[in-house]
């Protein structure tokens, strides 16, 4: 009678140990965030999260401000070894990975310069509207300037986010 109880006890200890070991796997970067990975993103339902937090390294080929949603759009030519982050749709942006810095993060996430070699950290997503993969939002960019969004930009984005929440809820 004691043998089945011992077997069950050993099984439970092994399960608990496996769960503990699984939880202790380090994230790919200390810049990964908890919570909703798409918090603050305009129209998040168009994005499918492939991974909550990924690292990408490459050279910036283009930086553009998107006035509608206030994002800073970065086209990143990936270093060798990071190509798996791309989809066929990324061919429409020159084979680059799209990286987006959202307005609420512009006070703490650097905006890189064209030609800079950078590392970025953030959720790796598929943009269903455009059909390409992105890091969106970028939670950390290794080089660039902090360019906070203006009060007017933040207000406009807040209205967009509120209207989007009303439209989808």
Regions found by a protein language model. Give the residues of each.
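OB-fold and OB-like single-stranded nucleic-acid-recognition modules
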Residues: 21-169
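C-terminal motif of bacterial Sec signal peptides marking the signal peptidase cleavage site
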Residues: 17-18
């Amino acid at each position: 009678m004691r043998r089945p109880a011992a077997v069950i006890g050993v099984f439970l200890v092994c399960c608990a140990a496996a769960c503990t070991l699984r939880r202790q796997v380090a994230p790919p970067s200390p810049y990964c965030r908890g919570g909703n990975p798409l918090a603050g993103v305009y129209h998040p339902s168009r994005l499918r999260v492939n991974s909550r937090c990924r690292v990408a390294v490459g050279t910036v080929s283009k930086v553009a401000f998107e006035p509608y949603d206030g994002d800073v759009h970065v086209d990143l030519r990936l270093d060798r070894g990071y190509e798996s982050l791309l989809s066929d749709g990324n061919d429409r942006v020159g084979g680059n990975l799209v990286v987006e810095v959202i307005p609420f993060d512009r006070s703490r996430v650097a905006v890189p310069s064209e030609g800079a070699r950078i590392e970025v950290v953030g959720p790796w997503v598929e943009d269903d509207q455009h059909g390409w993969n992105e890091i969106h939002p970028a939670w950390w960019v290794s080089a660039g300037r902090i360019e906070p969004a203006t009060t007017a930009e933040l207000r406009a984005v807040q209205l967009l986010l509120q209207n989007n929440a009303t439209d989808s809820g």
